[in-house]
Swiss-Prot record:
PANTHER family: CROSSOVER JUNCTION ENDODEOXYRIBONUCLEASE RUVC (PTHR30194:SF3). It is an enzyme of class 3 (hydrolase). One of its GO terms (cellular component) is Holliday junction resolvase complex. This is Crossover junction endodeoxyribonuclease RuvC. The gene is ruvC. It comes from the Bacteria.
């Protein structure tokens, strides 16, 4: 089974790809889809659409896990929600089942506390995937944590 975890955003979409082989979690890839901040919102959303389609075609994940978004009073709220909509649409188009997780649920599952720090989450991701270096940028570490949350739910602790 192969999973892709997604940390949504308009400027950067973090992704992390993990595979289960012989009951073990194997790190495959992580990174970010970065959009051109000098382009309009529609063009940036299209970049996310294109690049996520390319990632899916390359890695062929069986399932996806995406961070749930909660509304905060922020100027970026609408942009993130729009980006997340594009992400969900791509998975629907590719017939990939999506599970959604709140940030506090990811932190609790991965680091043992719903209020875990960014550092604690990164350390837990490194431990769970036997990584010697922290995934960079942080958006990709978050995406791996989201994927690990789904795998934990599936019984791969």
């Amino acid at each position: 089974m192969r999973i892709i975890g997604i940390d949504p955003g308009l400027g950067r979409v973090g992704y992390g790809i993990i595979e289960i082989q012989n009951e073990k979690k194997i790190f495959l890839d992580c990174g970010v889809i970065e959009t051109n901040k000098n382009k309009g919102e529609g063009d940036r959303l299209y970049e996310i659409f294109n690049d996520l389609n390319t990632l899916i075609d390359q890695w062929k994940p069986d399932i996806a896990a995406v961070e749930k978004f909660f509304f905060y009073r922020s100027s970026t709220t609408i942009s993130v929600v729009q980006a997340r909509g594009v992400i969900m649409m791509v998975f629907a188009f590719k017939s990939i089942k999506v599970s959604e997780y709140a940030p506090s649920q990811v932190k609790l599952t991965i680091a043992g506390s719903g209020k875990a720090s960014k550092k604690e989450v990164i350390e837990a991701v490194m431990y769970n995937l036997n990584l010697t270096r922290a995934p960079k940028p942080d958006d990709s570490a978050d995406a791996l944590a989201i994927a690990l949350t789904k795998l934990n739910e599936e019984g791969f602790n």
